[in-house]
Amino acid sequence: MSKLRVGLLFGGRSGEHEVSISSARAIASALSAGENASKYEILPFYIHKDGRWLAGEAPQQVLKSGAPLLESSNSSPADNNLVNSQQQTLERWQSPSQVAEVDVWFPILHGPNGEDGTIQGLLTLMQTPFVGSGVLGSALGMDKIAMKMAFEQAGLPQVKYKAVTRAQIWSNPCVFPKLCDEIEASLGYPCFVKPANLGSSVGISKVRSRQELEDALDNAANYDRRIIVEAGVVAREVECAVLGNDQPQASTVGEITFNSDFYDYETKYTAGKADLLIPAVIPDEISRQIQDMALQAFAAVDAAGLARVDFFYVEATGEVLINEINTLPGFTATSMYPQLWAYSGIPFPELVDKLVQLAIERHNPSH
């Protein structure tokens, strides 16, 4: 029986390029472990920070070193069939010949152009199965404003928020103060300012005063044209993993504890900065509620394959508020998603195997 050729797609043109490499290394290792070694052949594809797709030796080098390629010269023409970005657009989007050899794609591109529906649209056009959500689920899972609207429609409780645009923030001096007045009146302090379309806590600020609010809005506008401001809440941060397509399963619930002021990019991806507690020490009925809400959120955005759903548990009142869904969660050594499933009885190699099989199942539905 011939091996299934898995196109491991990583890197990308986003601020989470290095995170993508870390996830890809873990997945490549899992696809080569135990029984998976006899089932799968890995075809790695590395998307350079300049947007070029590289196959052959270049992605192997990145997987081995864990470091991104910094210079175009690091890859020879033999390893890269995609020409320079300075050349014609038509030529630039010629893909490496190995693309045609892929049986199923495993995109592990975090952030914009990776988990926002864009790469999912391309893979859909290729008519090849791929791991994870389709265009709609990915787009809703990436845009925090659209996501919250979907949650609201599904009746899921969440923190108060206000959506603003870059145009409002960078408008004339008369409009911006009024915008800040509205935010102060409706949300108060502390509150969180977030770019709508960036993952891994990039560009997020916790603000406690008018000056901090103004600075945070200006900073977030550098990252995105859509910004969301959320009311702060005193709560424990808990997470639940979801696995499946139309009949998904929810994992046990985990909790994130950290000493920093909030769960920012550095805290998330630096060993020792945050602790993952699995299972979370919370009442059983709260765990069941979180699992049920995670499945509702998964359906609300039309997710598929996998997702991690984040919640606030307000211990003082017993209230559970949904924070967000991540349709392509990290697969690094410190990532919550694979650890939640490991505790729930699905070790990492088996989890990766299930995700590949779910991709094929979704592409080829049967009665």
Swiss-Prot record:
Pathway: Cell wall biogenesis; peptidoglycan biosynthesis. Its EC number is 6.3.2.4. Mg(2+) 1 binds at D310, E324. Keywords: ATP-binding, Cell shape, Cell wall biogenesis/degradation, Cytoplasm, Ligase, Magnesium, Manganese, Metal-binding, Nucleotide-binding, Peptidoglycan synthesis. GO terms for biological process: cell wall organization; peptidoglycan biosynthetic process; regulation of cell shape. Pfam families: Dala_Dala_lig_C, Dala_Dala_lig_N. Mg(2+) 2 binds at E324, N326. It is an enzyme of class 6 (ligase). InterPro entries: ATP-grasp, ATP_grasp_subdomain_1, D-Ala_lig_Van_CS, D_ala_D_ala, Dala_Dala_lig_C, Dala_Dala_lig_N, PreATP-grasp_dom_sf. This is D-alanine--D-alanine ligase. It comes from Trichormus variabilis (strain ATCC 29413 / PCC 7937) (Anabaena variabilis). The gene is ddl.
